[in-house]
């Protein structure tokens, strides 16, 4: 700017921008579960490794009697910055993806198994049921298409989403995302909607 005598605007690409900041904390998570012959989920075991220990992100709301959730520290020489709901966005994906595997092992519909294990949590159920209803859960889907459901609690808010996908020549395309949220009293409903919409776009 000094050489040319005029202001210069510099815009980094996404790839360049990510190289000029510290990283999100890396984390790995291992799961095991015990499922009885009648489909009852007996135990849930989760051991995860990361530099810091999140307080509530790995905790599941499901009524599984035997739960073991354990953290081990993973020292790193890299500086990290836990911004933007890091723990919840990571552990929410881990736990809900594994829960679907548990549902398959139990021979249960993933939505119905969630309902069964949330019978004493009416607030969770209301959000889950609303997302499933608006998405038309249970309606037939065509070959090559898929539908998944998830539920996560973060900072006092409950969010459930149903995603419809299409697989074409081995590539996954997202057709629709249905999102339901209970954030308590919303001072700015438009702000809540914008947060959900932008979060979905960011995730994609």
Where on the chain are the PLM-derived regions?
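Cofactor-binding beta-sheet edge motifs in enzyme active sites
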Residues: 1-203
């Amino acid at each position: 700017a000094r050489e040319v005598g005029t202001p210069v605007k510099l815009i980094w690409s996404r790839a360049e921008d990510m190289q000029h900041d510290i990283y999100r904390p890396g984390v790995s998570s291992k799961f095991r579960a015990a499922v009885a012959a009648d489909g009852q989920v007996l135990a849930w075991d989760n051991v995860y490794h990361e530099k810091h220990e999140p307080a509530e992100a790995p905790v599941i709301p499901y009524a599984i009697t035997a739960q073991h959730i354990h953290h081990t520290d993973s020292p790193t020489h890299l500086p990290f910055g836990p911004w933007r709901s890091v723990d919840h966005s990571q552990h929410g994906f881990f736990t809900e993806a594994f829960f679907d595997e548990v549902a398959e092992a139990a021979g249960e519909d993933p939505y119905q198994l969630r309902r069964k294990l949330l019978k004493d949590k009416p607030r969770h159920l209301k959000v889950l049921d609303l997302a499933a209803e608006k998405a038309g859960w249970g309606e037939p889907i065509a070959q090559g298409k898929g539908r998944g459901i998830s539920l996560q609690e973060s900072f006092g808010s409950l969010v459930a989403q149903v995603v419809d996908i299409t697989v074409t020549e081995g590539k996954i395309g997202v057709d629709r995302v249905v999102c339901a949220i209970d954030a308590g009293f919303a001072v700015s409903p438009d702000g809540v909607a914008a947060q959900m919409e932008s979060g979905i776009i960011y995730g994609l």
